[in-house]
Amino acid sequence: MSDNSQKKVIVGMSGGVDSSVSAYLLQQQGYQVAGLFMKNWEEDDGEEYCSAATDLADAQAVCDKLGMELHTVNFAAEYWDNVFELFLEEYKAGRTPNPDILCNKEIKFKAFLEFAAEDLGADYIATGHYVRRQDVNGKSRLLRGLDGNKDQSYFLYTLSHEQLAQSLFPVGELEKPEVRRIAEQLELVTAKKKDSTGICFIGERKFRDFLGRYLPAQPGPIMTVDGQHVGEHQGLMYHTLGQRKGLGIGGTKEGGDDPWYVVDKDVANNILLVAQGHEHPRLMSVGLIAQQLHWVDREPVTAAFRCVVKTRYRQQDIPCTVTPLDDERVEVRFDDPVAAVTPGQSAVFYQGEVCLGGGIIEERYPLPGSVAN
């Protein structure tokens, strides 16, 4: 066993089970371990869904149980400037951003990494992400987590090999039930705590109410792809491609009782376009263009290559061909049509277990013949 006793690791303690068990595993590996709780959002309303106080108490209880110090830091200003404002801009433009990816890039593996190294003297940071790191020829690669159901590499594709080299992911080698089992054996307060969902650091508040505070909603018509007016939407920003719930429209004589899905957003005219059936041709894409590219462990690609892509989290791998258009953009052609490819979301590329990198979906290629010009 390598001597880790001189190495200091700061674990990002979220108040959840994954970071709790990560801290314990690192202690078992002989590291000097301390925790850091990041406050990244200033609550302004004191409502019960702001769970930061509960999360901090849980993180403190875990650190007390493990005999670890817990530091706290406030990154709310960095979060607002580098994550939240961009998030709002994307919604204003009719796109659907992924704030968790931006938060990992700007906060967890930038602000936190710098603070841990410079202020706390850390050799490494650690998080409870379900990913693995592999060092090859002096560069760190990002690998999928061992638990295919929980793999979170999709959210970490913006990391550089330099950032990865300073990061540890202890639970990436485990499956989730094993993580919970360890927490239960240790009698950690987080053992049965449910996994967090919702916007990174904003928690599980009602998304529509939350967004409406910062962006004025503009109600408008819901139209079918055939030009029928079937309802009203409360704001395009509340809807995303492929969405089924919350449309408030029933079946039609022509389409029967098949559920309605959002197939497009006409931002210029404030129209929400819908069609019936989850495989409606208007919902399908044969490819996409991705921009703001990031390759984890290498320079920009210069030649076409084969790989698989995910256009959203927990999606099945999609075989595709990636062709560079320039250093900042690639064209992706799927082997088979894919539903609900959404501009603003990320396309993330893999070869086997290795996450190569990804980019933001700029535009999608509709199924030929599905859109009337």
Swiss-Prot record:
Gene Ontology CC entries for this record: cytoplasm
Active-site residues from the entry: C103 (nucleophile), C200 (cysteine persulfide intermediate)
Disulfide-bond pairs as recorded: C103-C200
Interaction with tRNA (site feature) positions: H129, Q345
The keyword tRNA-binding belongs to this UniProt entry's keyword annotation: yes
Keywords, sorted A to Z: ATP-binding, Cytoplasm, Disulfide bond, Nucleotide-binding, RNA-binding, Transferase, tRNA processing, tRNA-binding
One BP annotation, GO: tRNA wobble position uridine thiolation
Listed EC numbers: 2.8.1.13
Reaction(s) catalysed by this chain's protein: S-sulfanyl-L-cysteinyl-[protein] + uridine(34) in tRNA + AH2 + ATP = 2-thiouridine(34) in tRNA + L-cysteinyl-[protein] + A + AMP + diphosphate + H(+)
Annotated region (Interaction with tRNA), positions in chain: 150-152, 312-313
Cited Pfam families: tRNA_Me_trans (PF03054), tRNA_Me_trans_C (PF20258), tRNA_Me_trans_M (PF20259)
Residues that coordinate or bind ATP: G12, M13, S14, G15, G16, V17, D18, S19, M38, G128
InterPro entries xrefs: MnmA-like (IPR004506), MnmA-like_C (IPR046885), MnmA-like_central (IPR046884), MnmA-like_central_sf (IPR023382), Rossmann-like_a/b/a_fold (IPR014729)
Role this protein plays: Catalyzes the 2-thiolation of uridine at the wobble position (U34) of tRNA(Lys), tRNA(Glu) and tRNA(Gln), leading to the formation of s(2)U34, the first step of tRNA-mnm(5)s(2)U34 synthesis. Sulfur is provided by IscS, via a sulfur-relay system. Binds ATP and its substrate tRNAs.
Family designation: Belongs to the MnmA/TRMU family.
Annotated protein name in UniProt: tRNA-specific 2-thiouridylase MnmA
Lineage: Bacteria, Pseudomonadati, Pseudomonadota, Gammaproteobacteria, Enterobacterales
